[in-house]
Structures are given as C-alpha cells and as structure tokens.
Regions:
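Short beta-strand and adjacent tight-turn residues that come in two discontinuous sequence segments
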Residues: 12-18, 93, 110-112, 116
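Short beta-strand-centered segments that line the small-molecule binding cleft or hinge
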Residues: 1-36, 40, 77, 103-106, ...
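Short beta-strand-to-loop elements that line the ligand-binding cleft
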Residues: 18-19, 64-65, 85-94, 129
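Short helix-initiation/N-cap motifs at beta->coil->alpha
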Residues: 1-5, 91-98
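Short secondary-structure boundary segments
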Residues: 19-20, 42, 113-115, 139
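A bilobed periplasmic-binding-protein/Venus flytrap-type ligand-binding module shared by bacterial periplasmic
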Residues: 39-43, 139-149
Length: 170
C-alpha cells in the first residue's frame, strides 16, 4: 500500500508491487509471476521434498527478511492466522544474504523463486515449492498515467516487461 500511495501522491513515477495490493485506482500493468519457495541447505531434512506447507516449517529455525519488509510483514500475518510464530534466528536485508545464511545451515527461509534460482548454482541450497495459493505472486507496475511518463521511465517499463517475458520462456 505504501508503494501505491507514493505513486498516487506523485512522489515516484513508477511503483512495483506483488501479491494482493490495493492499486488505489492507478494504472497497473502485469509484468511477471513469481513463486515463494522454501529454501533449505542441501543437508536439511526437507531438502528432498518436492512440496511442503508453510505450517509444516514453523517449528524450524528460520532466516527472514528485516521486520519492516513487505515479505516479512506478510509472513507475520500468515503466522498470526495460524496461531504460531516463526522461530526467527536472524533477519537480513537482502535475499542473497538470506540464501547465504540458509546455505550455511542457520535455518530455513521463504524466498522468491527468482532469488533462489540466482543463488542455486553457487550456494548449498535446495528449494521446495510451498503448497499455499498465496505462494504464487503476480507482479505489477503501477503508474498514474503510463502514456504521460518521461521516456526513461517508459524505457524501464519496456525493459522489465521484455526481460521477464524472455525469462518466462526459458
């Protein structure tokens, strides 16, 4: 909601959001779909699993994003509904840092599949699909009026759409 409000107020030209977000009447352009996955070290007991529910991992030591991040806020809401908090051992400011800690065996963590793929070849990581429908996140670009954007902003939108369209085909 904070990103959409910044676009609506004119503080930024473009906002990128994922999941269920009130777009506040702004123009929205779908540009990609990403999935949240469970990341574990390759030695973890869940590493060989294909799918897992979020509730199953709540007894595990966890690595999370910083408390104010959109993802950690969302996961906090999910755990509140489940009535059981995550056992967070450390909270970090980037998915790459999370993957390093997870690969080192500090705990398990929820990361976007795109971040997981970026780090899989160079880190000791396994990724397991989450069974919950909320784990699939649609991503949108928000603007007040896309046609009125400066050329550099339009170029950024074009690049994002082309990049993710090519990535989806591979």
């Amino acid at each position: 909601a904070e990103i959409a409000k910044a676009v609506q107020d004119g503080r930024v030209d473009i906002g990128i959001v994922s999941g269920q977000v009130d777009t506040l009447g702004l123009q929205s352009l779908h540009f990609s779909t990403d999935r949240l996955v469970l990341a574990t070290s390759r030695q973890h007991r869940f590493a060989k699993r294909k799918r897992i529910s979020f509730a199953e991992i709540l007894d595990e030591d966890a690595v999370g994003m910083h408390p104010a991040s959109t993802l950690q806020t969302f996961l906090g809401q999910v755990t509140e509904r489940l009535g059981k908090p995550q056992k967070l051992r450390i909270q970090l400011t980037s998915f790459d840092a999370m993957c390093r800690m997870i690969g080192a065996g500090v705990g398990v963590g929820i990361v976007p599949e795109s971040a997981a793929k970026r780090n899989q070849a160079t880190m000791n990581l396994a990724f397991i699909e989450l069974t919950e429908p909320w784990s699939v996140r649609e991503r949108y670009i928000l603007t007040r009026d896309q046609a009125a954007l400066p050329s550099y902003a339009q170029s950024l939108i074009d690049h994002l759409c082309q990049h993710y369209a090519a990535q989806a085909k591979s």
